[in-house]
Amino acid sequence: FLTIEEKSDAIVSLTEGDSKEWNADCKRKFVIPNSIPEIPPGTSPRTAQRAISAGRLTKEKAFHRMIAAWMKVYRIHPEWQLDIYGEGEEKKVLLHTIKALGLEGVVRIHPFSTDLEQEFLDSSMFLLSSLYEGFGLVLIEAMACGLPCIAFDCPYGPGEIIHHNKDGVLLPDFDKLSTDAHELWTMAWSVNKLISNPSLREKLGNAARENAKRF
């Protein structure tokens, strides 16, 4: 039987990481990342006391990691809020986690927004906690609005979009099943650092907007 590679004229992947998963004998491999239609005319002033995230509320998006990390943010910066936009089968579990951690009114889950761009413009940073991604287009959409992004270096996408400490923060991807491991401290620490340093938010956010132009 012929393999997929042998049957195909070419293999097109969204990321270099995914491309490497294919048979090395495949001679015609191309990487064509997703893109955004245009760079929005507006840029977030990054002054709102609000972080944002968006995506399907499913296990692979691992919003539980983000919510658990926010508990550590809340202890230092109780005035800040985390708004998550999305729907999915994990919604009830996540709402229960929010309540159990005493974060009701602090971490809020909203339905998918028809104007996510405006939500980005009304926020100061974007968070991604996925266990894996097909690409991570939402990162580029947030960066195009001038938001510094904090994401785990999961397969695949974030590591090929974010330049660590230049236009965002790329976190090591530790134990993917844990909610209390070192990974939560790294996300919380990074969020707290951006909250405490508006000039760093501005620097990373401006660089993020420029980086988004690659796509």
Regions found by a protein language model. Give the residues of each.
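A conserved mid-protein helix/loop that constitutes part of the nucleotide-sugar donor-binding site
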Residues: 49, 56-72, 89-95, 185
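Carbohydrate-associated surface elements
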Residues: 17, 35
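Short alpha-helical segment that forms part of, or immediately flanks, the ligand-binding pocket
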Residues: 117, 135, 140-144, 159-160, ...
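Short hydrophobic beta-strand element within catalytic cores of glycosyltransferases
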Residues: 148-152
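A conserved, positively charged/aromatic
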Residues: 1-9
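A charged, aromatic-enriched C-terminal amphipathic alpha-helix characteristic of glycosyltransferases
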Residues: 199-215
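Aromatic "clamp/platform" in nucleotide-sugar-dependent glycosyltransferases that forms part
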Residues: 112, 131
